[in-house]
Amino acid sequence: ELSAITQYINNENRISCGDCSLAKTLIGIAMAEMMHLQKLGELIVLLGGNIDYTAKYRDGRKKMWTPECLNIPAQVKSMLLADIESEKAAINQYEAHMKMIKDDCVNRVLARIIKDEEYHIILLRALMK
């Protein structure tokens, strides 16, 4: 979610043009992603975890999040395609986590976030027309 927020805000900043509906839609999606990040953080803390913004690999290594995690093309169409791919990757990741997590409450939150991500894809595809 941190990558999504940063990517959407970066894209919005680079294409912003006052009343531009494209930029407004991207900033709206970024706000939804912020809510996802907040809810996930809240769940992690409630379940006794720590928030550290690192990626944890299967071999135990950790890597701190950096802007290198982003895909930021120069052309608007490429931006939107990268955003769609990021949303699809997020959905796949949430679905994989739901298979590992046996807590119905947590899985309901993840399922709700997936619905938002699916809606973001619909919005992004509409912007490409």
What residues fall within each predicted segment?
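Non-heme di-metal
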Residues: L2-K129
